[in-house]
Each structure stands twice: as structure tokens, then as C-alpha cells.
């Protein structure tokens, strides 16, 4: 069984070196090209999909659409869920990473970005840019909408969707594409690959590169490769 992950193409804020998180930022021109090229690679390699899963953030949705369009599969059903959103970077969202490092120190910012269980500063729920003020999350209980997350909390958010939707689809023989974000995909990778809390700090998933997993019947990883 195969599973394909793709992190969204380079976003406008990736290009500006800003913390993005749940802020809804568009793809950059380079990101659009990355997504299109990913679709062409998948088509050339003969990949066909039965279902696609993505987040409710524009950069991932557009990446999913472009990948499917370039591989002549735009008709494939898509399920969008907040559970595949990027990790919520709390009060860091919108800040320049270099400026944050200058203010808080390189090591503190590295820990905020890469550690498994250290939380970043909390974003005030009353902030105009808080997800509490975004109608795409209006159906969620207020205590479910995050104000900041680490990777552990992100995994706790993503895992129920993996178990309820993605894993059953794979076990049913469906060919699955997951177009999401660096940290939601890192969380899923940690789970399916059995990566330790320490080693996950070193895992980087590049933008716009299809990551192909070969899985056994129990969804254990047999191999992984980038196209």
C-alpha cells in the first residue's frame, strides 16, 4: 500500500521568513510552481489517487488542487479538515524568525520551533488574528481552538483524523494523498515511522516535494522516498 504526503509549496510568508502557523497565507509564485511540478512528477511516475486530504488553510488547499490538476486528477474527492492545519505558533505568528532570534536568542527560538513538547508564547484569544475570530472554526468548541501548540499537541490534534479517516481509507485499498503542512506532516511521520521525541527535532519536510511511503497491511513503514 502507498501513501503520499506533500507539504504545501513555498508560501508568501515562508519566503519572508515569518512564523505562519494558522495564519491563512497564500502560495508564493515559487510555491505555485513547486506544486505544479509535484503534480507533473506524480503523473510521470504513474501515481493515481482515490481520495485526497488537506487542511482548511489556503496554501495547502491550493497545493492539493494544483497537484491533482497537473496529474489530471482534479476530480478526485477532497476532504478538508482543521485537524491537518499547520502547528499553531501562538504569539510568534507573523514575527520574523531572525528578529525573534535576535530578541529571544537563537537557542530559545530553535527550541520553540523544533522541540517536541515546549510551547511557544500564547496568542491572546482576543487578538484580531486569533483563530477564535475566524468563522472557519466557528463550529468548534472554544476550548478546542488552540492559542499555541507544540508538536506533541499537534500530534494529539492530527492523530484522531489519521485513525478515523486516513488509516481506514488506506486499509480499504484507497490510494491516498495528504497535502498539508510541515508540522502536521512531521507529526504524522512521527507516528507512522515511530520516530523518537528526540529524533523528531531533526526531521525536516521540504516544500512541494512528494514523499512516498510503502506500507504493510498494518500500516507499518516498509520504505519511504521523495520523488
Curated annotation (Swiss-Prot):
Disulphide linkage map: none
InterPro entries registered for this protein in UniProt: His_Pase_superF_clade-1 (IPR013078), His_PPase_superfam (IPR029033), Phosphogly_mut1 (IPR005952)
GO molecular function: phosphoglycerate mutase activity
Pathway of action: Carbohydrate degradation; glycolysis; pyruvate from D-glyceraldehyde 3-phosphate: step 3/5
Residues of the site described as Transition state stabilizer: 181
GO biological process, alphabetically ordered: gluconeogenesis; glycolytic process
EC id: 5.4.2.11
Keyword terms, alphabetized: Gluconeogenesis, Glycolysis, Isomerase
CDD domains, per database record: HP_PGM_like (cd07067)
Key word Metal-binding present: no
SMART domains xrefs: PGAM
Reactions catalysed, as given in the entry: (2R)-2-phosphoglycerate = (2R)-3-phosphoglycerate
Annotated positions binding substrate: 7-14, 20-21, 59, 86-89, 97, 113-114, 182-183
UniProt-annotated catalytic positions: 8, 86
Record flagged with keyword Isomerase: yes
Pfam families (UniProt xref): His_Phos_1
Broad class of enzyme this protein falls into: isomerase
Family matches, as NCBIfam families: pgm_1, PRK14115.1, PRK14118.1
Known partners and oligomeric status: Homodimer.
Family of the protein in this entry: Belongs to the phosphoglycerate mutase family. BPG-dependent PGAM subfamily.
Role according to the record: Catalyzes the interconversion of 2-phosphoglycerate and 3-phosphoglycerate.
Protein name: 2,3-bisphosphoglycerate-dependent phosphoglycerate mutase
Species in which this protein is naturally found: Actinobacillus succinogenes (strain ATCC 55618 / DSM 22257 / CCUG 43843 / 130Z)
Amino acid at each position: 500500500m502507498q501513501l503520499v504526503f506533500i507539504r504545501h509549496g513555498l508560501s508568501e510568508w515562508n519566503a519572508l521568513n515569518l512564523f505562519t502557523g494558522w495564519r491563512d497565507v497564500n502560495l508564493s509564485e515559487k510555491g505555485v510552481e513547486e506544486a505544479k511540478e509535484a503534480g507533473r512528477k506524480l503523473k510521470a511516475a504513474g501515481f493515481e489517487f482515490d481520495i485526497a486530504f488537506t487542511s482548511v488553510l489556503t496554501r495547502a488547499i491550493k497545493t492539493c488542487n494544483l497537484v491533482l490538476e497537473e496529474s489530471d486528477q482534479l476530480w478526485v474527492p477532497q476532504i478538508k479538515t482543521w485537524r491537518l492545519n499547520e502547528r499553531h505558533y501562538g504569539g510568534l505568528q507573523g514575527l520574523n524568525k531572525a528578529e525573534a532570534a535576535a530578541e529571544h536568542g537563537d537557542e530559545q527560538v530553535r527550541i520553540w520551533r523544533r522541540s517536541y513538547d515546549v510551547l511557544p508564547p500564547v496568542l491572546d484569544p482576543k487578538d484580531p488574528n486569533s483563530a477564535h475570530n475566524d468563522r472557519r472554526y466557528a463550529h468548534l468548541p472554544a476550548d478546542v481552538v488552540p492559542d499555541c501548540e507544540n508538536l506533541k499537541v499537534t500530534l494529539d490534534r492530527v492523530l484522531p483524523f489519521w485513525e478515523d479517516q486516513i488509516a481506514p481509507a488506506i486499509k480499504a485499498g484507497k490510494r491516498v494523498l495528504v497535502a498539508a503542512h510541515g508540522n502536521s506532516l512531521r507529526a504524522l511521520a512521527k507516528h507512522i515511522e515511530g520516530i523518537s521525541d528526540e529524533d523528531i527535532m531533526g526531521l525536516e519536510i521540504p516544500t512541494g516535494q512528494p514523499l512516498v511511503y510503502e506500507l504493510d497491511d498494518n500500516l507499518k513503514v516498509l520504505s519511504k522516498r521523495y520523488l
